[in-house]
């Protein structure tokens, strides 16, 4: 399975967070909303954390999103991965992928970096630049994407869990997000 921002938004809606589309419509508005409304920020962060935990507990999933690494620290059946690349290369990739000017692509990358860092810091007190929080760090400026995928697959199939080690499978998660995750992945299976 694969879960990203769009998945998180659907799950948030299923869990009763109707303001989620407005939060996710604009990157700037998303964070403005968090800083202006502390209670709403706390509620959204708590539900996002619950969704990440429920998704990880479901198993056999790749999670892509801001701060997913934070609540999944220390679990032997989880690989926290940081994929990075030099800023000029990231800007070039965004220019090509989204057909943006260099100036707009630069602004996009810088804003996204700031948002990811702010979310991890304000939600978990962590920095995504602290590479000790990751089990594997891949620089796609040096390693091509096919090799990176092979490494990730090999790492995922080589996990070592010892008896008594904490696992995502053993997490205690809230029932509402757990049911929403199961429903989402069942829906996707039917679409295949």
Residue positions per predicted region:
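Divalent-cation
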Residues: 65
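Short loop/helix-cap segments at secondary-structure boundaries that form the rim of catalytic
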Residues: 70-76, 129-131
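Conserved phosphate-donor/acceptor-positioning beta-strand/loop module used by diverse small-molecule
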Residues: 74-96, 102-111
């Amino acid at each position: 399975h694969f879960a990203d921002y769009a998945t998180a938004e659907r799950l948030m809606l299923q869990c009763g967070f109707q303001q989620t589309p407005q939060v996710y419509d604009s990157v700037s508005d998303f964070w403005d909303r968090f800083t202006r409304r502390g209670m709403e920020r706390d509620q959204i962060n708590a539900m996002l954390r619950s969704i990440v935990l429920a998704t990880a507990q479901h198993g056999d999933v790749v999670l892509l999103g801001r701060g997913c690494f934070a609540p999944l620290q220390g679990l032997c059946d989880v690989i926290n991965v940081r994929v990075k690349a030099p800023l000029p290369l990231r800007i070039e990739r965004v220019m090509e992928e989204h057909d943006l000017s260099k100036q707009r692509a630069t602004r996009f990358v810088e804003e996204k970096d700031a948002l990811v860092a702010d979310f991890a810091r304000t939600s978990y007190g962590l920095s995504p630049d602290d590479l000790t929080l990751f089990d594997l760090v891949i620089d796609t400026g040096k390693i091509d994407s096919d090799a990176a995928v092979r490494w990730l697959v090999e790492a995922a199939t080589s996990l070592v869990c010892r008896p008594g080690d904490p696992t995502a499978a053993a997490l205690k998660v809230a029932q509402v997000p757990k049911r929403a995750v199961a429903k989402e992945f069942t829906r996707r299976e039917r679409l295949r």
